[in-house]
Amino acid sequence: MIAAIGAVASNGMLGLNNWLPWDIPEELAYFERTVAGAALVVGRLTYESMDVVPVDTFVVTGQKDYAVRSGCQRVASVEAALRQALATGKPVFVIGGASIYAAAWPYCDRFFLTRIGKPFDGDTRFPDSIPLDRWTVVEDREERYLERHSGEAVVCRFLQYAQPVFKPLPAV
């Protein structure tokens, strides 16, 4: 299984200063539970924003001398990262950022996307190139949580999309 997971505000924003534009602990806990024990594919900037990085994290960067933490691997392309992540025998999750989602979605059979029911300021948008309208919604549930920056209640819609036909990884 190759899946992607992320969250997006109602105005399409998914990041601000290499982190989330919102502070919703329950949504972050959902992310952590969902990816627990998986191999992760992540872009360099998202990787640098992470306090805790599990083993079997594959960091996509063009910087050949980029040093990663113990248990992680630097890779030059999304395809190489996905191949190496699959070789671990674990489920694989693509966790961002935007350019990594845009490059990886054709290979994903699932996309776990939380839609945050409020606009947020941000500097990174969810990629318009991902045609989720052509995917099948296989799970859809809503919860209301407190967003800690604003103190307001926010609806989080937890969606799981299935892509009926996904692209096989090219042979090495």
Residue spans for each PLM region:
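Enzymes that bind and transform nitrogen-containing heteroaromatic metabolites
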Residues: 1-172
